[in-house]
Amino acid sequence: LIDSKQKIKSEEKVVLVSVIQKDNTAEQVQEYLDELAFLAETAGAIAVKSFTQRLDRPDSRTFVGKGKLEEIGNYVASKNIDLVIFDDELTGSQLLNISDAIKCTTIDR
């Protein structure tokens, strides 16, 4: 589930991100985030916060919208977050665009 190339370090503070699309309910997405938090914590990380955004479809460049990405970036900077985990598969360019925008290592499920 979590990319084996990116190892989560013990006590690493992580933020989780998911998009609620038209075929998902908020409750389903919360269940997915709870599972992702459990996986991260099993790997030794501390899941600090979850961000969600309702979109018809994910943004092709950054998966989430510009405002949400800015909100995540501000939180990451203010709380010294080590890693951001998206609860979906991202393209290589999306991962790069997100990491560049929020100045934090970003991985996907």
Where are these regions (language model features)?
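N-terminal accessory targeting/assembly segments
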Residues: L1-R109
